[in-house]
UniProtKB/Swiss-Prot annotation:
The keyword Acetylation does not apply. It catalyses: nonane-4,6-dione + H2O = pentan-2-one + butanoate + H(+). It comes from Sphingopyxis sp. (strain 113P3). This is Oxidized polyvinyl alcohol hydrolase. Its main location: periplasm. Its EC number is 3.7.1.7. Optimum temperature is 37 degrees Celsius. The gene is oph.
């Protein structure tokens, strides 16, 4: 005969206590997880202004912090990056070079990394940063694209030092200032734009989006092999809607990314780069921005905005401050995890033409 089991008072008390302990454990776990979002290397404390000797991948790195003014709650983050020939401090404070520190006046936490080749000097322009890369990398300022020979094969799957440094830098700054975890953005011009592409491709779990300005894609054939520069231009021009593999990211390119918003900027007909003798003209940002826009637009949970202008191969020159603020507010309007169908594109400042999706003005 079945007899119901009647729990004693002590057993009921134990179950109640166990339930309470489970709830406490869950709360503590959640709190610990929130705290673990922000962490510094042991003994390092971030500060406003220039931070040096930040340990990352066995190296000492530097970055500049410009805290937000009058930011309510967690501040959205903007990480601007220079290219080959301009200094970090120019990018922060000189209108021609970006004037990005001004965004702190609008509530953004601005964190500007110093290139490894600059040896922690935020005032170094070209110098040692202007040249061909080494140790498996294509170009010198950032570890942004793998070399076309066997030395670069490792970086088909390894993100590289700079991708890890950028994330570690932001996580450390978050230990001192309250940051908005769903609004972490980065961007850059030229090699800085290429570095933006690489970070978004390898680390989409961390970033909410970015703005590559005239960045490289280092387009390749489907098998990942490289063709000469002039042939690459013809290759993309012959199939401008194709998804091109690129040495900027993993090989093969990921079929999925975490939700993000990406604004790709093309500087128009004069958006070219001459590497000087003996190389000469070595990059055309028409095919590179076309290829990047094709890829990001093909990922269902990524919002891609294609912007064209006429400033050439520079940080956007027309209404610079207004464009920067428009771009950051556009990205901030789409925090990480937002549905692409809810995204609304507002009109950019005068001098820019922007649309959702891939570029359709590059090739007629």
């Amino acid at each position: 005969m079945f007899k119901p089991v009647v729990k004693s008072r002590s057993s009921r008390s134990f179950c109640y206590l166990a339930g309470c302990l489970a709830m406490v454990a869950a709360t503590l776990s959640s709190t610990a997880q929130a705290k673990s979002e922000w962490a510094c290397p042991e003994g390092f404390t971030p500060k406003a202004g220039l931070n040096t000797d930040f340990p990352s991948d066995g190296k000492k790195r530097a970055f500049v912090v410009v805290p937000p003014k009058d930011s309510a709650g967690g501040a959205p983050v903007w990480v601007p990056m220079v290219g080959t020939v301009e200094a970090t401090n120019w990018n922060l404070n000189v209108p021609r070079s970006g004037n990005n520190a001004k965004l702190a006046e609008h509530g953004y936490m601005v964190i500007s990394p110093v290139r490894q080749c600059a040896e922690q000097d935020p005032n170094l322009g070209a110098g040692a940063c202007n040249g061909v890369g080494k140790d498996g990398w294509t170009w010198n300022p950032w570890n942004d694209g793998r070399a076309p020979d066997a030395s670069g094969d490792k970086y088909k799957t390894d993100a590289g030092d700079d991708v890890r440094f950028l994330e570690a830098m932001v996580r450390c700054v978050g230990t001192k200032w309250k940051l908005d975890r769903k609004r972490l953005f980065l961007g850059g011009i030229s090699a800085g734009g290429t570095m933006t592409n690489r970070a978004l491709l390898f680390d989409s779990e961390f970033w909410a989006g970015g703005m590559p300005i005239s960045g490289e894609w280092y387009s390749t054939k489907d098998d990942g092999s490289t063709v000469p520069f002039q042939e690459t231009r013809k290759m993309v021009a012959a199939a401008p809607a194709k998804i091109w593999q690129g040495r900027v990211g993993p090989y093969p390119l990921p079929s999925k990314l975490d939700p993000m918003v990406v604004i790709t900027v093309w500087g128009g007909e004069k958006d070219l780069w001459d590497c000087g003798p003996p190389l000469g003209l070595c990059s055309d940002y028409r095919p590179t921005t076309q290829a990047s826009s094709n890829y990001f637009s093909s990922i269902s949970n990524v919002v891609h905005v294609a912007c064209s202008a006429t400033h050439g191969h520079m940080w956007p020159q027309v209404n610079t401050d207004a464009f920067n603020l428009w771009a950051l507010n556009t990205m901030a309007s789409h925090p990480k995890g937002s549905s692409p169908k809810d995204f609304k594109l507002t009109a950019p400042p005068e001098g820019y033409s922007c649309k959702i999706g891939r570029f359709t003005d590059h090739y007629k």
